[in-house]
Amino acid sequence: MSAPNPKAFPLADSALTQQILDVVQQSQNLRQLKKGANEATKTLNRGISEFIIMAADTEPIEILLHLPLLCEDKNVPYVFVPSKAALGRACGVSRPVIAASVTSNDASSIKNQIYGIKDKIETLLI
């Protein structure tokens, strides 16, 4: 695999990527996940996104780069993971997924895990 695109910042390390993909999988099971750049944009505009995950190997990466700007406007943490194929598997679909949004639900059983990941992503952004 080639070096990740320098525009893909912040990029999660392998341990954090694994934790993020686990939470993505659990949120998919609880119907708290939106898949794709367009749906991620919609969750940001509606104010229901907890955090945004994007794939660093997206080609061309510019099709995603409106999301970090929108995230900063809305004060939502965002992170890049190395592989769109792995993100697609975690989202429970057979195709690659370039962006996903974990949505908020106060009654969720994985609320604490979501907040834990959110804190780790926020420390990457500093």
From Swiss-Prot:
One GO term describing the cellular component: U4/U6 x U5 tri-snRNP complex
One Pfam family hit: Ribosomal_L7Ae
Entry annotated with the keyword tRNA-binding: no
Keyword Methyltransferase (UniProt): no
InterPro entries: eL8/uL1-like, H/ACA_rnp_Nhp2-like, Ribosomal_eL30-like_sf, Ribosomal_eL8-like_CS, Ribosomal_eL8/eL30/eS12/Gad45, Ribosomal_eL8/Nhp2
GO BP annotation list: box C/D sno(s)RNA 3'-end processing; filamentous growth of a unicellular organism; maturation of SSU-rRNA; maturation of SSU-rRNA from tricistronic rRNA transcript (SSU-rRNA, 5.8S rRNA, LSU-rRNA); mRNA splicing, via spliceosome; snoRNA guided rRNA 2'-O-methylation
Similarity annotation: Belongs to the eukaryotic ribosomal protein eL8 family.
Protein name, UniProt field: 13 kDa ribonucleoprotein-associated protein
Species the sequence originates in: Candida albicans (strain SC5314 / ATCC MYA-2876)
